[in-house]
Amino acid sequence: MPRKKRLWSPHHYNHVVMRGNNRQSIFLNVADYDAFFRVLQYAYQKYTFSIIAYCIMSNHYHLLIRSPEVPLGKLMAVINWRYSNYFKKKYQYCGHLYESRYFADLVPSQLDMLSVSRYIHRNPISTAPPIVENMEDYPYSSYHLYKHNTSTDYPFLNTSILKNCLLQTSQFYPPSYCQYCEVQQNK
């Protein structure tokens, strides 16, 4: 049975998740995390895209990503193929690196963008036991860029969009994006 074709909207962000096969680790050390960013940089040179939140865990990654020029599937094929080749070559790994095709969910509104980005940034403190006590202490997440108001050398990372979303919906949320992320959800 053929796979269902994914919907692509060049104007919307998508929450993308990719997990290691059998939930195995696909990022084993700092060099692997760095290699993933080199892959993103390579993909950006081919196809322009924007990431407003990310979290790279040891066995999966989350991206809040928009691909305005090409269908998301084409972009993700480049990213996942390049990283898979890197990993297989480095570790002499055979077989499928990833569990299945990437998960992607269209994020239709600004409120949804805030909610999804919060979920992404809370990943390191939501594990049992938590990987870190504070979100800003996890080095492989975009949260520290928001917390410390720092810039990045990666042109595909954009931290202004979520701040603008929060400003436009500020009657519902705390005054800063980081406060919004740090508030314990009552669900």
Question: For each of these PLM feature ranges, what is it?
Answer:
Residues 59-67:
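Short beta-strand->loop micro-motif that forms the acidic, two-metal-ion catalytic signature
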Residues 1-53, 67-187:
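Short Pro-Cys-Gly-centered "Cys-loop" motif that presents a nucleophilic cysteine in a tight turn
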